[in-house]
């Protein structure tokens, strides 16, 4: 029943916007763009990812949404027709959530859309965008993002806010990440930042 309500809500939202599906966009920050202090202010516990994405899709420009929050990155994946309006709305959400000002937040963010957004997430899931290249945790974290994003409502969390576009995109990058790890040697060496630190200390 919960899954049916979720589907009806999404269909109603798309109907109100002319029934057209938007295209993907990612807004976020990482160890490459932001300090630990800024990343910590944006961090969201995994148990609250769906609550955050539910708030995001309340914005009129956003059709679908998913959140990925780790120690080294915070990324919001959305689907929208008007990427300018979507960027404005996601930025508003990030300001409210973090309590950071425009000047504190804006310089740390990156924005990618359409094919660039997909390629970015492929690099993330494969471990190519990690602090330690090929580290093993990130694929599990992207898988968790996908699982939450497509989940039905439960006693523990709201339903995910991914629809056709984000659902397919997240599933595809998880499959690609698995393929990269099984068919290449990228996973050799340190599997995480902590293990890399241990190796350097020995």
Positions of predicted regions on the chain:
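N-terminal mitochondrial targeting presequence
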Residues: 1-18
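A glycine-rich (often HGG/GG-containing) alpha/beta subdomain
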Residues: 15-130
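Glycine/serine-rich phosphate-binding loop and adjoining beta1-alpha1 elements at the start
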Residues: 104-202
């Amino acid at each position: 029943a919960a899954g049916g309500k979720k589907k009806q809500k999404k269909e109603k939202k798309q109907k109100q916007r002319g029934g057209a599906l938007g295209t993907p966009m990612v807004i976020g920050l990482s160890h490459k763009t932001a300090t630990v202090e800024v990343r910590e202010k944006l961090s969201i516990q995994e148990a609250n990812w769906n609550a955050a994405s539910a708030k995001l899709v309340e914005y009129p420009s956003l059709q679908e949404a998913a959140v990925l929050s780790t120690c080294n990155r915070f990324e919001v994946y959305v689907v929208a027709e008007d990427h300018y309006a979507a960027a404005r709305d996601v930025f508003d959400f990030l300001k409210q959530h973090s309590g950071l000002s425009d000047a504190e937040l804006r310089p740390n963010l990156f924005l990618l859309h359409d094919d660039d957004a997909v390629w970015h997430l492929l690099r993330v899931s494969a471990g190519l965008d990690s602090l330690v290249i090929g580290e093993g945790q990130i694929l599990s974290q992207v898988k968790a993002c996908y699982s939450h994003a497509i989940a039905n409502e439960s006693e523990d969390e709201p339903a995910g806010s991914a629809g056709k576009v984000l659902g397919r995109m997240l599933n595809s990058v998880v499959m690609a990440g698995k393929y990269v790890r099984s068919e290449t040697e990228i996973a050799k060496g340190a599997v995480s930042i902590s293990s890399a630190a241990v190796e350097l200390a020995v």
